[in-house]
């Protein structure tokens, strides 16, 4: 019988729909668990947006969840949780450690030091975002990017632009794997009609966010 691949995952807040990374991790890990992988997600401590009853969920769709110590202060939550997740994954019995985002990748050298195979998924050039553009946060995230280049066995990027950036900046080969989407279930917009009195084909609905 073939032995299961043991995989540790961190970088997400928790398995929820709080953000893009969380959705990617949830969808990816759920499918990998269905395909026979043994997966542990190291989640950040703190309140789950879906309600307090979800804060300490141990298992989700075949995925083992563990909460790591977290300093719940602005600017420290992601750093502290990523550090402890890196330690846990380094000392745990895992074949692969999959790290999501540039900031958490700062600590990718820790599991690598303990002989783990490390994969880093770069969801975007976070250091260039407006909220991180200046100061310590930007420098930390940028160093995380450099550590991924230096220590990760494989790097996954989600866009051709970021793939080109890594090649031109670091001469580093990456794997371009864009995010997939679930086929939508088409439903009648009855709630919109009931609430706003708008009929089908009489309006345009735009959903988006500012980053």
Task: Identify what each model region corresponds to.
Residues 161, 180:
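Carbohydrate-associated surface elements
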Residues 60-87, 130-137:
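A short, charged, and often flexible helix/loop element on the N-terminal side
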């Amino acid at each position: 019988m073939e032995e299961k691949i043991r995989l540790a995952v961190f970088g997400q807040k928790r398995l929820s729909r709080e953000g893009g990374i969380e959705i990617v991790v949830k969808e990816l890990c759920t499918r990998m668990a269905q395909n026979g992988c043994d997966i542990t997600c190291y989640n950040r401590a703190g309140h789950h947006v879906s309600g307090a009853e979800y804060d300490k969920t141990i298992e989700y769709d075949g995925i083992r969840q563990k909460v790591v110590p977290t300093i719940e202060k602005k600017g420290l939550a992601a750093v502290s949780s990523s550090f402890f997740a890196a330690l846990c994954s380094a000392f745990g019995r895992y074949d692969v450690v999959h790290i999501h985002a540039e900031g958490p990748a700062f600590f990718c050298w820790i599991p690598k030091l303990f002989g783990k195979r490390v994969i880093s998924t770069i969801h975007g050039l976070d250091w260039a975002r407006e909220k991180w553009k200046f100061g310590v946060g930007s420098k930390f995230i940028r160093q995380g990017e450099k550590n991924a280049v230096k220590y990760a066995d494989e790097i996954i990027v989600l866009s051709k632009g970021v793939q080109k950036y890594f090649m031109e900046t670091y001469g580093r080969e990456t794997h371009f794997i864009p995010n997939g989407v679930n086929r939508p279930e088409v439903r009648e917009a009855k709630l919109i009609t009931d609430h706003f009195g708008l009929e089908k084909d009489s309006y345009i609905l735009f959903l988006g966010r500012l980053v």
